[in-house]
């Protein structure tokens, strides 16, 4: 077997499991290749709400929140912080493709449904969602994949969880753990909206999950045949 590890940490984990170093190659994650290919394609939003947002004039915050461990008090805190930010910054447009879980939808409507610059929309397919991320100023999420994808587009990510399975992102500075307390989430988002240096530090940090060339590196390894084929 060959092992194409997205990150150095992934490689080190494989080594600790006893896998031979000569069969492990750090390539980046192929999902970033796919993301950047989609992001480069021309696309016009079909969604009525998204088609009316002036992404050049507004600072768009993309939100996703769906994890079961956040249901209840934590989700109330998260949505409360997002609502507070939306009310304080009239140049911000919050876009939240709401998960289909009825409990998530109820909480979202209760906290955010009456705020004029918060848009609760239906879930998006991949291409429009990538375009939404690409046009965003900031991402607030409890999703795992977005912690890898949004930084590839130069977007800071606040993770509304107590922990993350993507520690490389935190170490690289592309992601910050905002936790699940309302005041902390609010303050961290506010900092990114008011402190250009803090924003740029995250936006320009190098994404540890790849640069869009993982597939090429994998192909190069296979072509070179620098491994035992048996």
Indicate where each model-derived feature is located:
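Nucleotide-activated sugar donor-binding and catalytic core shared by glycosyltransferases
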Residues: 1-96, 101-230
């Amino acid at each position: 077997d060959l092992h194409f590890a997205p990150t150095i940490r992934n490689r080190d984990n494989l080594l600790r499991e006893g896998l031979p170093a000569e069969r492990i190659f750090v390539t980046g994650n192929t999902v970033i290749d796919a993301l950047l290919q989609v992001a480069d394609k021309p696309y016009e939003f079909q969604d009525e709400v998204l088609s009316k947002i002036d992404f050049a004039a507004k600072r768009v915050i993309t939100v996703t929140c769906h994890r079961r461990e956040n249901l209840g008090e934590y989700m109330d805190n998260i949505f409360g912080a997002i609502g507070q930010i939306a009310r304080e910054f009239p140049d911000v447009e919050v876009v939240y493709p709401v998960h289909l879980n009825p409990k998530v939808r109820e909480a979202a409507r209760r906290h955010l449904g009456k705020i004029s610059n918060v848009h609760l929309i239906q879930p998006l397919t991949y291409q429009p969602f990538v375009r939404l991320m690409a046009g965003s100023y900031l991402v607030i999420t409890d999703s795992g994949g977005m912690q890898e994808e949004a930084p590839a587009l130069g977007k800071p990510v606040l993770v509304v969880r107590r922990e993350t399975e993507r520690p490389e992102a935190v170490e690289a500075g592309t992601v910050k753990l905002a936790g699940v307390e309302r005041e902390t989430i609010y303050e961290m988002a506010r900092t990114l909206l008011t402190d250009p240096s803090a924003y740029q530090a995250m936006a320009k940090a190098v994404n540890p999950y790849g640069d869009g060339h993982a597939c090429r590196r994998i192909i190069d390894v296979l072509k070179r045949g620098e491994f035992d084929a048996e």
